[in-house]
Amino acid sequence: MDCIFCDIVKGRVPCHKIWENDEHLAFLSIFPNTKGFSVVITKEHFSSYAFGQEDQILTKLILATKKVALLLDESLEGVGRTGMFFEGYGIDHLHSKLFPMHGTGNNSDFKNIESKINKYFNSYEGYISSHDCDQADDKELNSLANKIRKTKLK
């Protein structure tokens, strides 16, 4: 199996390591869309869909990611918070991504910061966004909520 993250763990491919423990490794992305954009990976290969993992594996990854996020908050000027997300479509190896939120201050106190983007996604476009869009219709939301509540997990 060819896996760039496995090669990084084995030292076959270099990385800009920022943190590690026995089970996880964190490094700066070589394709950052903001300063400090980082990836936290499991050293053991697991499939990239985070919510398909055993609870213990995912929990450990989240706790490792928290440590790295707090390092980013402390080390990057003007970063009060760091966002975390699981996407899993770039590389099929379990990982989280960390997005330092530059311009949010030097502490994690809440500040209301709203996006000016107003885009609704009908399909995945290769990235995740957390901005709000137009208010949805209550009848449509109620129908969707009912459908989700009635769904049984396999």
Question: Model regions: which residues?
Answer:
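HIT superfamily nucleotide-processing domains
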Residues: 1-154
